[in-house]
Amino acid sequence: METSDELKQRIGDLSYEVTQHAATESPFTGEYDDFFEKGIYIDIVSGEVLFSSLDKFNSGCGWPAFSKPIENRMVTNHDDSSYGMRRVEVKSREAGSHLGHVFSDGPKEAGGLRYCINSAALKFIPYEQMEKEGYAQWLTLFDET
């Protein structure tokens, strides 16, 4: 089992604070905010698959935005009343990493949700590297594209 110090060393200070203490990276600073390459996004802590580039859109909010996770079972939702707001926190199912929040102001044609996710909680696996990185089973997501 990885200790907190080992995890922090492996993923970095910002990713550690975001995933383990529900911190939020500053808007428009994350690596994946304005990034639209073909591939999947995984939990930086556990490597569990979370989102696809097929469901990513430019919301203008300053963080990566997705209309849905690859499968709903991959994330869990939790009420969040911090900072005097009522929001729904999104965590990864396996590791329980804080990812961000989900809002109901997403594209209507894609279900109406906007998963506003911290780049620091994610690792991007390019389509061309998915098989090599152990994510071959998810290649079929892109068969129609």
UniProtKB/Swiss-Prot annotation:
Single GO molecular function: peptide-methionine (R)-S-oxide reductase activity
Domain MsrB: 4-127
Active-site residues, as the UniProt record annotates them: 116 (nucleophile)
Xref: Pfam families: SelR
Top-tier EC class: oxidoreductase
Keywords tagged on the record: Oxidoreductase
EC nos: 1.8.4.12
Gene3D superfamilies cross-referenced by the UniProt entry: Peptide methionine sulfoxide reductase (2.170.150.20)
Domain of life the protein comes from: Bacteria
Biological process annotations from GO: protein repair; response to oxidative stress
Entry GO terms, CC: cytoplasm
InterPro entries reported in the protein's UniProt record: Met_Sox_Rdtase_MsrB, Met_Sox_Rdtase_MsrB_dom, Mss4-like_sf
Catalytic activity: L-methionyl-[protein] + [thioredoxin]-disulfide + H2O = L-methionyl-(R)-S-oxide-[protein] + [thioredoxin]-dithiol
Claim: Oxidoreductase is one of the keywords in the record: yes
Family designation: Belongs to the MsrB Met sulfoxide reductase family.
Name assigned to this protein: Peptide methionine sulfoxide reductase MsrB
Species for this entry: Streptococcus pyogenes serotype M18 (strain MGAS8232)
